[in-house]
Amino acid sequence: MTAHVRERHTHCSLLWNTMRSTATTLLLVSTVNGLAIPSSPAEQTRRAITSIRSAILEPSDKPKRLFIDYLIPLPAETKEEDIDPWPGGLAQMYPYAEDIIRDILKGVVNEAGQCSSQVLSAPDCCGFFIQESQEDPKKDVAAILFPSVDQLDDIERIDEMVGPDRTLILMNKQFQRPADFGFTGMSKSRSKSAVFDRFKWGFAFQELACRGEDVKLTFEHPNWYSCAVCDEDVDLGSQQIKLLEPQLERPAYGALEAKINEVLPEPLWMRKMGEAKDKGLKFQR
């Protein structure tokens, strides 16, 4: 999915102890405010359903066109030494993602009935799902799984078929911006009008490396939340350090980096060095 990047002596020890106390305080604030990241696939699915339902019920922004970025859990057989946990790419992910999108759609739709599906593109591992509502056909929800730039025609066709009263979701899209459809020409312009100008976020759980830190972003309607996950201290365990305040727009990399510099002034490698000096090497404890 994504790779994580891991970025003299009395002075370092004092700084480390101070930061550890600060990190603990920030973690408590994060937990109290309910910003903790999903701790399991089941929790991620539950929170995705809640966020999407909230977005659908929002009276503005019709027709409902939503993005979902779901962090697909690694297969049970994954080992720590595996360089690529998904050597089969999207084809390997698809069965897991199919179960996930079915669970989400079933949870989003009131009185969920049958969920039908079809393959839009076998080479691109792209599928189409329709979750019917037994309460009202206008409450059916459709979803396209793993749409790529090659599915622009399909997105436009399905958007028209779904109509203005029903919701259409793009889950784990394989593009980020209009330029991905080409720097010039009609495809770029069409993608902007058909996708980027119409779709808004319904739910997201994303991870990225920022200044060598493991950063998690979540979107739960209507806000984006951000935190850094620090797990270099074995005794303290994994800590979620709140970064930016909840905001309507996805946090920019520069804003995240500036906040990390404020709350974690020492880079990861220096904190690990301080821990080793204070407590000894992990295998010696």
Model-derived regions: residue spans:
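Positively charged, amphipathic N-terminal segments that serve as targeting/anchoring signals
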Residues: 35-157, 161-166, 178, 276-281
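N-terminal chloroplast transit peptides
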Residues: 1-36
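Composition-driven, intrinsically disordered low-complexity tracts enriched in small residues
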Residues: 24, 265, 269, 273-276
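A conserved mid-domain beta-alpha-beta active-site/ligand-binding segment of alpha/beta enzyme cores
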Residues: 179-265
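C-terminal structured domains
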Residues: 259, 272-284
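Residue-level detector of flexible, active-site-proximal loop/helix-junction positions
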Residues: 75, 175, 248
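Redox- and metal-dependent alpha/beta enzyme cores, enriched for Fe-S-associated oxidoreductases
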Residues: 167-184
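Ordered hydrophobic segments in well-structured contexts
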Residues: 65-69, 141-145, 167-170, 216, ...
